[in-house]
Structure formats: C-alpha cells, structure tokens
Amino acid sequence: MLAPMAGVTNVTFRTLCREFGSTRGNLLRPAPPHLRSPLEQSQVGTISGLYVCEMVTARALVERNAVTIHMTTFAPDESPRSLQLYTVDPATTYTAAKMVADEGLADHIDMNFGCPMPKVTRRGGGAALPYKRRLFGQIVAAAVRATEGTKIPVTVKFRIGIDDEHHTHLDAGRIAEAEGAAAVALHARTAAQRYSGTADWAQIAQLKQQVRTIPVLGNGDIYDASDALAMMAVTGCDGVVIGRGCLGRPWLFAELSAAFTGRPAPAPPTLGEVAEIVRRHGKLLVAHFGEDKGMRDIRKHIAWYLHGFPAGSELRNALALVKTLDELDCLLNRLDGAVPFPDAAIGPRGRQGSPAWVALPDSWLTDPDDCTVPIGADIMESGG
C-alpha cells in the first residue's frame, strides 16, 4: 500500500507506482492492463496493492474547495481509487464519506490519524486525536455508517501514540475494529518521534495480537523489499504501507511485487533509466498542473531520484531550478546514463528530523473520554 503523502502522492506519482507494481519483465516498461496475465490483473487493487491519494480534509471536500477537488484527481484506469480523509468531526466525516459514496468519488476511504505536525496536533487533529477514544470511535463509526450498502471499505491509519507515556494504538485498533473498519495501519512511531529514530515494529506485533478480525498493516522503516518481508515475518502483520521509502523510487513497487510473488527481483535502474523515469514523471506533472507548477513540483522529486548518484553540484543546482520540460530534457542528457544504481542510494530518504515535544490543545490529556470536537482542527490553509 502506498502511504498518502502531502505534495507527493498525487495522480502522477501514483501512476508511476501503479505501473511499476504491475511490472512484467522490463523494469522500465510495465505491462499495461491488456498485457497482464489473469493472475497479475487479479492482484491489482488488492489490500497490498492500494495507492492512496494525498490527504484531503473532510470539511474542504464537503465545501467543494477547488484545490481539494483537484487533489482527488484519479487516472482514468486507476482502480481502486483510494482517497484519504483527514477529519476531527463525526458529522462532517459522515457528510464527506456519504458524498464520496453517493457521487462515486472513490472506491476506498482511508482515514488519517497519524499526522505529527505541530500545526495539526496543537488543534487536536492527526496523531493527537486517538487519545480522545470516544471521539475517535464516533468518527470511524460515522464513515462506516455513511458507506453502508456500498462496496467502499473504510481503513484507519494511526501512530503508536502521542509519546512514550501516552500510547493509543491498542485502543485505537480495537475501537476501529469494533466500529467496522476494514483494516488498520500502524506507523510504528509516536507523534513525538515524528520521522526520526527507528520504527518500533514490536508495537505492530502487539497490535496484531489485539486486532484479530481485520487486517493489520505495518508502516515504518521499509526501504526495500527485504524490509517488507522482514516486517511481516517479525510482526505477523498482514501487509505493509510504504511511505518515505519510495520517494524517488517508484520502482520499489516492482521489487515488492516480485518479493511477494516469489519472483526474481528486477535489476535496479541505472542512472540513465532513472533519468527516463524522471522525464516521464515531469511530463505527467505538466499534464496535471501545467508547465510552471509541474516543473516546480518535479524539483523535489529530482533530489530524491538522484539520491546517492554522482551528478555534480552544478548539474544538481540547475535541476533544482528547472523551469520547462525542454530544459529538463537537456539537463538530464548531461547525466552519465551508464552509472549503475549505487549502494549509497539504498536506505532512509526524505525528512527525518529529530524528536520533539508534541503541541496539544490546553488540557487535552485531562479526559480521554471527552468527545468534544476540537475547534478549528479541520481547517487547512492548503485546501487539502
């Protein structure tokens, strides 16, 4: 499962990940649907093959915010269409989930209770919310109730808890299971850890022991296919969620597909092959956003794509300022395409940072059974 990541998992990146997830043979030429074997086609869109769009707020969706609606763009052949909702209010959750169901906006709803960012937690949202267990249960129940009678599953993603003194994942898992969630996913870090340190896979194993009737997915520190297999072996979880590990590496899903089906791993791409993937990503972004915004967006991806490769500071700096597709093409032609995939490109990528105190609303920890909806927690400046 591709984890929703703000500013990353839009339709363009999901397209690349989906294509690689159904690769047959050549890593750079994924098999289109009409060329997949019946077995390959049947595996596309299973719980281990979901590619979730970047998070949108339930309130912004209900208000039909233009930016939010554009963020929920899916490719014509994308199936199932997975949408993640950020929400703090049962009533708004119900309205948003009902809108998704009634208008056919998506085939799967994931719910975000894992964001550790201060602007979110200080208002009681994201990773702070599961501490309010009654409110958390009401929100999950609202989404499930809104999709009753449809084939739209509701899944729930959360963290271990606020910090080492306030773990919430076991309660959250049991509550989500009781309220009808189809699966739960645990990012095995606390909000205080943010993206730093090491994911505590033992907590995934504990959650799996507590949640028995629905799948439990694990998230955290999966950077290659062997990590995914190791997590499942160690924790007993039913599947994995890939986040930062696939930044600049959409072909990771080809490696995962091979590992889970017992096929030989595809050869890692050369620098020339990576350049071709960057070109395709850039073209998809321009088609989605237009050239100006598309090229501004590709810049961060280029840094991830070239992670560990020798490229030189001058060329990297030029790529970090690229403005047009033609310029992108010229700059990529300057790379040495024969360079093999380097060992330095393997391992952690993306933001890591340091642990930090978690900002919370006043008296947030006083009563975990308080189901008062936090004020202003569902208002995002981005429209997402």
From Swiss-Prot:
The organism of origin for this protein: Mycobacterium leprae (strain TN)
InterPro entries in the record: Aldolase_TIM, DUS-like_FMN-bd, DUS_fam, DusB-like, tRNA-dHydroUridine_Synthase_C, tRNA_hU_synthase_CS
Keyword Nuclease present in the record's keywords: the answer is: no
> Which controlled-vocabulary keywords does the entry list?
Flavoprotein, FMN, NADP, Oxidoreductase, RNA-binding, tRNA processing, tRNA-binding
- Locate the residues binding FMN: 4-6, 84, 157, 219-221, 243-244
Which GO molecular function annotations are given, in alphabetical order? flavin adenine dinucleotide binding; tRNA binding; tRNA dihydrouridine synthase activity
Its annotated function is as follows: Catalyzes the synthesis of 5,6-dihydrouridine (D), a modified base found in the D-loop of most tRNAs, via the reduction of the C5-C6 double bond in target uridines.
State the name under which the record lists this protein.
Answer: Probable tRNA-dihydrouridine synthase
